[in-house]
């Protein structure tokens, strides 16, 4: 829960991101945060299914609180890295809420959203690092109008930002919509809370984009604002391609998850069903295509 981080054990994350260099922030967001969620999926829930069933309602509430808290805190940040760090608290809260929903759509969406979050948030930290390399400040108030000097960067930042906000057609949408459907099947009230992540994400990311890249240039004579060089394009363009591909063709990845998610839920929900009063887990080998027919 600390590693995820799950509210209220999240307090280390913003400070860690602010103090870390760009490469460490990317690694932390893209890989290390996922180790906590992986621990729940790989060890915690399968090894202790009855405990998971008993604590799932309470942990789901904490995850839902983290979604709203992380989004609201991101709205008031003055440092770009702190804003992205609190967005991670909100997005990982949605992932954990889906994990604790213990159904097929939510679990598959949680796994896919972990991949999406790693791509989008890692790319956000790369973009913040590029700006910091040029201006040597991460304060949002110290920036403005950078798109006039950095149009290619502004376009890439826009795609990354919209993917993090869950725009349809980009990678964040497919994972989020699966999480929402799964959470709705488990708890309609928490599903309503979870949807706020879309509204809050759009609010703080669009606010960040407007303050940093749009409007008049803060310092028209600043020679440091230059567009992306070949090295920066070499590591950002593949990420953009993957963001778009995962958004347009999520089935390529989700079909690979169907069988393993079904087996996972067999292991977790069979002993947990009596405790939570849940429906039986999907049959082993059940696919997304026949799942709806079996439910009918």
State the predicted function of each range.
Residues 1-211:
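Hydrophobic transmembrane alpha-helices and their helix-loop junctions in integral membrane proteins
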């Amino acid at each position: 829960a600390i590693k995820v981080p799950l509210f209220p054990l999240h307090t280390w994350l913003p400070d860690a991101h602010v103090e870390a260099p760009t490469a460490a922030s990317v690694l932390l967001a893209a890989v290390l945060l996922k180790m906590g969620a992986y621990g729940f999926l790989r060890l915690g829930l399968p090894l202790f299914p009855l405990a998971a069933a008993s604590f799932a309602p309470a942990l789901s509430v904490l995850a839902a609180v983290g979604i709203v808290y992380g989004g609201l805190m991101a709205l008031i940040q003055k440092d770009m890295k702190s804003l992205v760090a609190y967005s991670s608290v909100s997005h990982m809260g949605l992932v954990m809420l889906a994990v604790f929903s213990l159904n097929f759509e939510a679990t598959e969406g949680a796994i896919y959203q972990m991949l999406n979050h790693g791509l989008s948030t890692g790319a956000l930290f790369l973009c913040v690092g590029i700006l910091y390399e040029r201006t040597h400040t991460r304060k949002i108030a110290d920036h403005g109008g950078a798109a006039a000097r950095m149009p290619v960067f502004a376009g890439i930042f826009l795609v990354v930002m919209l993917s993090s906000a869950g725009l349809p057609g980009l990678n964040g949408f497919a994972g989020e919509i699966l999480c929402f459907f799964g959470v709705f099947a488990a708890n309609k009230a928490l599903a309503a809370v979870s949807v706020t992540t879309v509204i809050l994400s759009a609010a703080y990311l669009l606010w960040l984009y407007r303050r940093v890249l749009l409007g008049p240039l803060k310092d028209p004579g600043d020679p440091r604002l230059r567009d992306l060089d070949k090295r920066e394009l070499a590591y950002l363009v593949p990420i953009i391609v993957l963001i778009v591909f995962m958004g347009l063709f999520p089935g390529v990845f989700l079909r690979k998850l169907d069988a393993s998610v079904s087996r996972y839920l067999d292991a977790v929900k069979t002993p947990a069903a009596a405790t939570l009063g849940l429906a039986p887990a999907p049959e082993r080998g059940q696919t997304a295509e026949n799942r709806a027919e079996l439910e009918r």
